[in-house]
Amino acid sequence: MQTDCSVEGFDFGTVEGRAVEAGFDAGLVTSDAGGLLLGATDRAIGMMGRFAACFHDERRPELIEHEVATLVGQRVFGIALGYEDLNDHDELRHDPLMAVLAGKLEARREDCAPIAGKSTLNRLELSKLASTRYHKISHNPMAIRALLVDLFVEAHVRAPKQIILDLDATDDPMHGEQEGRFFHGYYDCYCYLPLYVFCGRHRRSALDAADGAVEEMARIIAQIRRRWPRVRILLRADSGFARDDLMAWCEANGVDFLFGLGRNERLVAEIAAELDLAAAKSRRTGRPERRFKSFMWMTRRSWSRRRRVVAKAEWTQGEANPRFVVTSLRRDECKAKYLYEKVYCARGEMENRIKECQLDLYADRTSAATMRANQLRLWFYSMAYILLCALRRIGLHDTDFAQATCGTIRLKLLKIGALVRVSVRRIKFAMASACPAARDWGRAAVRLAIAALARASPA
């Protein structure tokens, strides 16, 4: 073991007669060497350059130290590595791994670090939709939204026969006086109400969950069909989206839907016989029992036509638990029991993805004063999520991390300590020899390199 002495440090007792000390004085060392996989993932999917192209920079080139592409990459890679707070970058701008990922090793001016600190990144997040005197970097929301759909389409090797788009709205609690802040009775807090499809879109919480869904679906589906003209599309969502305008749009545009339906007395009366049968059998067996029924239905005022409803008549814990869904799928295409249990209930997986975005990628960190800035933050978080998902999909299939959450991937594969050796010709990251995930890390690195080569040299 190498013996070192330090003037300043922390004392942690002794082990076998040797004093244990620690200090932040090792120089070129990084705790995020595994993040090299993120750079390899970006080369495999070509995301960061296209995301940076969604920004317009009107700063004077001769005065610029940090270009937009560097700033965007630094922010997204930082979030993916677990640094959601811009304050972290005042130290990370000296980190060799972050410099490698951002693609900038040396500063042009002596008084600058190679990459940006918190103030410069904050100005990026506060960028306007158009350049102003004090904000020279602007972003194009439509281009960013289009890129998100492009990345989804490109994640498929070939056009699928059918895709299912899950919609959901969730609360993003507010703890300040942000623009668009309203109290939401269901969530019992002041919040935003972002609409998630495969990315998030911020809305004021005063809106209905389904508000804006028609416009978003029209845009997304049109873009998907330009690439996959024959794909069948099913929209799946809870009862908050069972609105006549959305269902009518789906019917007019050849899009299938499967939405939860809020129960009422008329619907429950429709399945009274099935509930009685389920209750009788439950009393005999002592177990929950359920029956299913499919029927045509129309509301008294809000719907413009009759639609197929599938009901689950369930008796559990001594009481009725009826549930309903409305769908455009015909009976000959999908039987009632399979439709509810296998198709509709599978939407619960989206709840896990939303939790992953908010807990592992910090998508609820929306403390900027304006909705515009908070929306841009949400897009940064979304890009970091896409990057980690691509790492999982391309590099980690058939490994122990194939189904791991983004947080687990970060902890086990990205948070690896390394000594950094810099020479004229190379930068060597000497990672910890005792890394438990070294084998899977190596597999991912090889797979991502192959994918990047295939992207650079398409057949």
What are the residue ranges of the model-derived segments?
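Acidic, His- and aromatic-enriched active-site or binding-groove loops in soluble protein domains
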Residues: Y186-C191, A218, A252-L267
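Conserved nucleotidyltransferase catalytic core and NTase-mimicking acidic/glycine-rich helix/loop elements
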Residues: G35, L388-A390, I394-L411, K415
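Dynamic "connector" segments at or just before major functional cores
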Residues: M1-C189, L193-A209, M217-A222, R226-R227, ...
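Short, glycine/acidic-rich hinge or "gate" loops at secondary-structure transitions
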Residues: D90-L92, L105-A107, I233, L396-T405
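Structural motif
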Residues: P61-T70, A368-L378, A404
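Acidic/histidine-rich, metal-coordinating catalytic segments
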Residues: D168, R232-A242
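An anionic, glycine-rich sequence signature occurring as long contiguous blocks
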Residues: D4-G23, D256-L359, A445-A459
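Short amphipathic alpha-helical "interface-anchor" segments enriched in bulky aromatics
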Residues: T41, L339-L376, F380-R392
